[in-house]
Amino acid sequence: MKFGLFMYCTVGRRNELEQGMAGRKPELYQRMLSEIAQYAEFADQAGYFGFGHPEHHLQIEGFEISNDPCLMAMWLGSHSKKMKVITCGFVSTANNPLQTAEKIATLDHMLGGRFGVGLVRGYQARWVENYKVLPELSAVGPWNAKTEADDINREYFAEFVDIVVTALKSETMNYQGKYWSFPPKDFVNPHDHPVYSNYGQGVDNNMAISEIGIAPKP
């Protein structure tokens, strides 16, 4: 059996949160970062398997200021040596799946193979509606369970996961889905340079792009 920790990244004590707008107070955020560093160092030394955190945005109230999962992962990683750093996780409705795969691969290198990944559908409507990558997407929760919005979100999520996994496993790929196409159909790179055709793959001498891949390889 393995044990891990999970945090929501709450910036204030109860009385500080109840004063309002705690998330906008730099001194509280700085204190939280310092405390997270101490938690990570202790958990690492105590032998915990991993330390997890979510992706949430626009949290002016201060309850869940995890923001960019990559930045928080690097903060945790910089204060630990052995345990996994786990994001729970990249919110599909707010992220480009190809870029997500690239971030995962890059972070795993930077963390020495210690990056753990979760992919999720997104349930906090306030920030998802402001960050979503496609207009037809919505956050999901009890208020819209088993509705068309829920079905679209689930269908999109399945494609998102498939693209992330395909990009991580493939040297290059051509993915034509319902929501995403990588590379875009009939795309010709206007930056005409022989480096693309001579030292890569998936591009012809006319700069027509038929395949694309992430770098580095995980």
PLM regions: where:
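Active-site mouth loops of central-metabolism enzymes
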Residues: 18-34, 90-98, 145-146, 218
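Short, well-ordered coil/turn segments that N-cap beta-strands
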Residues: 1-3, 47-50, 80-85, 111-116, ...
